[in-house]
A protein has these predicted regions:
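An extracytoplasmic/periplasmic, membrane-proximal ligand-sensing/linker region
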Residues: 23-29, 34-45, 217-287
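Pocket-lining segment of extracytoplasmic ligand-binding domains
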Residues: 118, 129-231
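Beta->alpha turn/N-cap motifs
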Residues: 30-32, 62-66, 76-89, 103, ...
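N-terminal signal peptide c-region/cleavage motif recognized by signal peptidases
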Residues: 17-19
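A local structural motif
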Residues: 52-62, 77, 151-164, 198-200, ...
Length: 287
């Protein structure tokens, strides 16, 4: 009997220890980094710095996009996901995922851009034209620019025709007169200016500073682990940001910051942006 009890207690002890070990490892995905090799290359220095600061072990979970990431979280395959504002809204609606840390980048806003020689002066002048919005469902390339059109009194897919073109293809279409404007964020303006040095571009509308990218957490992760993650960013933010921006792929975060007091309400503005493209239920990504 004593041997049986001892064996039982030993088994319970092993299970408890296993649970603690598992809890000390967090599974981490990034929605816009495709594949494990790219994830290790772009986020490796950040991973090392975070593990050293937090005492938690990070296990990369590669995904091929936002849909795979939300499905992985639904299947309890991933704990934390770094994603954009528009994607967060869907994660929250589908899974009740919550924001833990905001990843802010400087000058994160949407614009509408035309050729400098264009007769278009305001968004209202684009009525009846085609407009390219880059990546469909993107906060800064799609929802934000559409909101600028809505603020000018133009209804999506009614007063103008939305198209979705690769950025450089969109510029070529703009030069050819096939589209009237392009929806971009600030860094994209810099990119096309460098890519097309013989062209002059003009911004006809600039949006608000958009809500930041966000590290979100699955509902089943323990509050203690969530608090450890949040505290690590709050106390070691400068070191983590330096590690993050050590790779060229994360240059967009240079000059940015981490915010450990982010709330779901901070993304209500994105929900309103979705409404501008006719979406009032947020359980599916825009495809």
């Amino acid at each position: 009997m004593k041997q049986t009890l001892a064996a039982s207690f030993l088994a319970l002890g092993i299970l408890a220890a296993t649970g603690v070990a598992a809890q000390d490892t967090i599974r981490f995905a990034v929605t816009d980094i495709d594949g494990l090799e790219a994830l290790q290359r772009e986020m490796g220095p950040f991973k090392d710095a975070f593990e050293a600061s937090s005492g938690l072990k990070v296990e990369f979970f590669p995904v091929s996009g936002r849909t795979v990431a939300v499905e992985a979280m639904a299947a309890d395959q991933v704990d934390f996901v770094l994603t954009g504002p528009a994607e967060y809204v869907v994660f929250n609606a589908r899974l009740d995922a919550q924001p833990v840390v905001a990843w802010s980048r400087p000058d994160y806003y949407s614009t509408l851009v035309v050729l400098d020689a264009s007769p278009v002066q305001t968004p209202a002048d684009l009525k009846g034209m085609k407009i390219s919005f880059g990546e469909i469902g993107s906060t800064s390339q799609h929802l934000g620019p559409v909101t600028l059109m809505s603020e000018a009194g133009l209804t999506y897919s009614v007063d103008y025709e939305p198209v979705f073109l690769n950025r450089n293809v969109a510029v070529e279409a703009l030069i050819a007169g096939d589209i009237g404007a392009i929806g971009l964020n600030r860094t994209h303006i810099e990119s096309i200016t460098e890519k097309f040095p013989d062209q002059k571009f003009r911004t006809i509308a600039k949006g608000i500073i958009l809500p930041p990218d966000v590290l979100l957490v699955a509902p089943g992760v323990s509050p203690e682990v969530v608090e450890t993650v949040r505290k690590t960013f709050a106390e070691q933010g400068d070191a983590l940001l330096a590690a993050l921006t050590a790779t060229e792929a994360n240059a967009k975060y240079i000059g940015g910051s981490f915010g450990a007091t982010v709330t779901d309400a901070d993304y209500d503005v994105v929900r309103k942006m979705y409404e501008n493209i006719g979406i009032t239920e947020f359980t599916d990504f825009v495809e």
